[in-house]
Amino acid sequence: VDLGFWPEKTEIESLLVGNYVHSYFETKEAHEAFLERNQDKIISQRGKTAGQVKASFKQADKMIAALEKEELFNRLYHGTDDEMVEKERIITGTLEGIPFKCKIDSLNLSGGYFIDLKTMESLQSEKYSTTLHRYTKSLLYNIVEYQYTLQMYVYQELLKQTYGYEFTPYIMAVSKEPVPDKELILIDDTIIEMGRDIFYGNIKALKDALAHKSVEGCGHCDYCLTNKSLTMAKTVAEFLQQ
C-alpha cells in the first residue's frame, strides 16, 4: 500500500502546491528540479496573466516564508549541524501481511522523531467532524477526517521495524490563507491509537483491495466521486437518514 494518491490525482493543482512547498524544504536542487519539471503548471498559459506565476503558487511562496522565519521549525525540520537528518526518506515494511511504502518528509535519526509537512486550507475555521460528532478546528478535522491518524501510526510502525526503536511523530501544518497560519503538532498516543484502530478495523478491506477483489467504497472521497455513476433518483428523506 502506497500511502499517497491514485495516479489520476497526482496533477491536481492543490497537490502541486503542496509538493512545491515540500520540495523547497527538501533541498535547493530538489526545488529547482520541481520548478523545471512543472513550469507549464506553475506559469499561467492563457489570458491576461499569461507568463505570470499562478496565484496558488504565489500563495505557496507566502507559506514558505511563514515557515522559513520560524526558528523552531527550522531547528526541528532541518536539524542541527551534528544531527543526522534525512529528507523525503522512503520506508517500506509489512504490517499484518500487508506491504506498505511511505515517504517521510523529515526524519531526524539523531533526535528520534519525524515530521510530516501538511498544507491545509485553514487551521482555525470550524468544520463538523463525523468521527468526533462535533464542530472542531480545521486542523483537528484534517488530522481525523483525512486519517492522518492512520498515516502516523503506519509511519511509526515501519520506522520501528527499520531501526528497532520508536520515533516521535510531529505534523507541521501551514495554511493557504492570505496570511498563512502555522502550528507544530506533537502526535501523542491518543492519535496513534486512533490510527491503530482504523488499521485493524480495515485489514480485510486492505487485503481485498490488494487481491483486486471488489470492495465497498466510502462514497464521498475524491476517488469514489471520480468513479460515481448515477443509477436512480434519491429522496430528501434518504439524505436526512444518512
Which residues fall in each region the model found?
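Short histidine-centered catalytic/ligand-binding loop motif
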Residues: 8-10, 49-52, 128-146, 188-190
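A residue-level signal for conserved active-site and pocket-lining positions in enzyme catalytic cores
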Residues: 22, 106, 199
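Coil-to-beta-strand transition motifs
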Residues: 97-101, 108-112, 166, 178-180
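Conserved catalytic cores of phosphodiester-cleaving nucleases, focusing on short active-site segments
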Residues: 102-138, 155
